[in-house]
Amino acid sequence: MIKEKVRVKIIAIDFNSRKGWKLYHNEDLYGNTEIADDRFWNDVQEGYYKFSKGTTLIADIKCPWKIEEPLKILKVHEVIYGD
């Protein structure tokens, strides 16, 4: 099913810097494609996503692209850009 608004749980590494993370879709579905949309990362930096319980980022993403369910985060790497 194609959805334009998806709720995603992202396991992050470092909440102290909160500068943005390099995320990857499920490898089987997307070949480890990086989520690189600037608007998403800008929203993360501006604090539009709710941080809760340790290293989990709860994000209601209104996607600028169409994606198929399920969207799963395979792995997360630390900050991809600085101040």
Tell what function each PLM region has.
Residues 1-38:
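Long, positively charged binding patches that form subdomain-scale interaction surfaces
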Residues 5, 73-76:
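Hydrophobic residues on conserved beta-strands that form the core of alpha/beta folds
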Residues 8, 48-71:
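Flexible glycine-rich surface loops and low-complexity tracts that mediate binding to linear polymers
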Residues 12-14, 65, 80:
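A generic structural motif
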Residues 40-47:
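Short alpha-helix capping/helix-loop boundary micro-motifs
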Residues 77-83:
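Short peripheral tails and domain-boundary helices/loops at the edges of structured domains
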